[in-house]
Amino acid sequence: MERIKELRDLMSQSRTREILTKTTVDHMAIIKKYTSGRQEKNPALRMKWMMAMKYPITADKRIMEMIPERNEQGQTLWSKTNDAGSDRVMVSPLAVTWWNRNGPTTSTVHYPKVYKTYFEKVERLKHGTFGPVHFRNQVKIRRRVDINPGHADLSAKEAQDVIMEVVFPNEVGARILTSESQLTITKEKKEELQDCKIAPLMVAYMLERELVRKTRFLPVAGGTSSVYIEVLHLTQGTCWEQMYTPGGEVRNDDVDQSLIVAARNIVRRATVSADPLASLLEMCHSTQIGGVRMVDILRQNPTEEQAVDICKAAMGLRISSSFSFGGFTFKRTSGSSVKREEEVLTGNLQTLKIRVHEGYEEFTMVGRRATAILRKATRRLIQLIVSGRDEQSIAEAIIVAMVFSQEDCMIKAVRGDLNFVNRANQRLNPMHQLLRHFQKDAKVLFQNWGIEPIDNVMGMIGILPDMTPSTEMSLRGVRVSKMGVDEYSSTERVVVSIDRFLRVRDQRGNVLLSPEEVSETQGTEKLTITYSSSMMWEINGPESVLVNTYQWIIRNWETVKIQWSQDPTVLYNKMEFEPFQSLVPKAARGQYSGFVRTLFQQMRDVLGTFDTVQIIKLLPFAAAPPEQSRMQFSSLTVNVRGSGMRILVRGNSPVFNYNKATKRLTVLGKDAGALTEDPDEGTAGVESAVLRGFLILGKEDKRYGPALSINELSNLAKGEKANVLIGQGDVVLVMKRKRDSSILTDSQTATKRIRMAIN
């Protein structure tokens, strides 16, 4: 204050003002400060001062040929005097205006391609709708969000290689483009940017925006996908929010969303199979999302969600070190604990074995709709500060924290028996048993917890057992806060291990994730998810199982038919026929299977009864363990569309319809593919007689040497294989029979098999 008063007094004297405005600045320190180094010390001032001059710009001498000395208004555009210290010309700002209006034009075709992300953003904003502004307290929590809509998911290194290859193809330096996405993008961009005149550095910068995910740790209340984040400054302030619907979606958000849907479906399906881990890996490797292999997306995409992280762990990728319980992400912020098994009694006198965490610990809990800070000691909740969007969300967080605290009053609040099971009908572990129990009904838990009077603390209020707010009393240790708790900001990833039952543990053996933590929410994916694994056929119901099973047989008919004739047992045990069994009425499975297998054996034995369409139609029924009975069927029942529908053993039906003219198969009216061969068997050729005593195995196999003529076959030993040239120059693989007794049927089946092998 003293200094300011002193300055005011000085300024009131006219002499002071004169000194400050009129005298030259010749103090060495000041001159040094403003002239040393290349860095401009006061850019704004410099700009104003420069632009006040007549010719603030310097340009190359060639400009004198390209721009007139005066414009239409007669104003001078450049000065004949050289710029001091260089051979450049001094130019007026008016010259820029002249150039922009009358200068040479260039092709603009590359601009939308290079500045694609900007053009797309403008489109999204143009078509977006802004709703009303609401004034209310904003509970924002910092989350790691994607700030760059419309990007691919390349790593920085991968993107760098692509950019170098596209923008500076002749530069030296090893560039390895390995991933499919790298190659596709490089090819596409090279074509798009042919003869592009935009500065290479600018192109490189813009390409980086398109290829790499950029994330920031920002305070958000509401949507976290990148199309919302790009308008964050327009949609939420400290005390207001504006409703907004984006005017378009971007692929990266769709990939994130679809990845979560696919991962959840896969984890749920794997849980119920005999070997969950093997099944999960098989499904991840055979699934595509929007035409890209799921495993490639998992390697590149940083989305953190329980199911996604389980898939990543299975692939041996690192994941975040936080753990999940009750749908909340827990991160320990201080303290430590040791684990010890302890037996406890529920209110129903059921014994539970729980792993007790002994020691003082603090955690942040972050969920989709609520966040909290939890301080706990051994089997005791010390303090829980919750914030959430609504009463329901806050209650969810409180239940999870109370169960996690392992307090005795929580365990004693259990009424009835705990016998929750997972999808595979296995009992859940005790902690999840308790969680499920109270998620169904927490009344007793809240009533038994106890309440306490509270102090008036800014921004905090109490919450009563019926979940209503109060300023006087609150559940013991629990407070509701206006402020959210930030998500864990670190992006560090740790090495984890996963067991057969998909439980993910860190190096110290703490369970971070398990299938119980995977949300049951059924979302609809934005991008097409193609599950090639037969394990996922049932995801869209019985009809899809039926169609997929027949499509699979037709797609693999080449190998299927050879197995059908040589090794039917291997064929019947294929996992692709498993989902189909759930469609066949339980009581009939064994009888149908026995019937079909007998029928197939007759086809193998008797001339002219081989019928491709019939084999395809009945094959899935033969996969069940057969019952030996003399039962004959004219139709087989499958349960689809809520009732039993019939497949006719001979002839077409609405379920299975083969059109001879088009050679296409429709299953329940859906196209299931085309048969590439002619199912009508013709007359036996001469080869069948000659090939007596040989078994036709299928197409030519180069490992067995060059093709022999039919006459040379007599030299083969029993069980020996060879390629043979038959008929119209076709080559098939045969094996000399080990037993003579079966020679009779050879000539009958040979024709059919030759036909099959050639086709």
From Swiss-Prot:
Domain of life: Viruses
Avian adaptation, annotated site positions: E627
GO cellular-component term (any): virion component
Subcellular location(s) per record: Virion; Host nucleus
UniProt KW keywords: Cap snatching, Eukaryotic host gene expression shutoff by virus, Eukaryotic host transcription shutoff by virus, Host gene expression shutoff by virus, Host nucleus, Host-virus interaction, Inhibition of host RNA polymerase II by virus, mRNA capping, mRNA processing, Viral transcription, Virion
GO biological process, one term: 7-methylguanosine mRNA capping
UniProt keyword annotation of Lipoprotein present: no
Record's function text: Plays an essential role in transcription initiation and cap-stealing mechanism, in which cellular capped pre-mRNAs are used to generate primers for viral transcription. Recognizes and binds the 7-methylguanosine-containing cap of the target pre-RNA which is subsequently cleaved after 10-13 nucleotides by the viral protein PA. Plays a role in the initiation of the viral genome replication and modulates the activity of the ribonucleoprotein (RNP) complex.
Subunit structure, as described in the record: Influenza RNA polymerase is composed of three subunits: PB1, PB2 and PA. Interacts (via N-terminus) with PB1 (via C-terminus). Interacts with nucleoprotein NP (via N-terminus).
Protein name per Swiss-Prot or TrEMBL: Polymerase basic protein 2
Species for this entry: Influenza A virus (strain A/Duck/England/1/1956 H11N6)
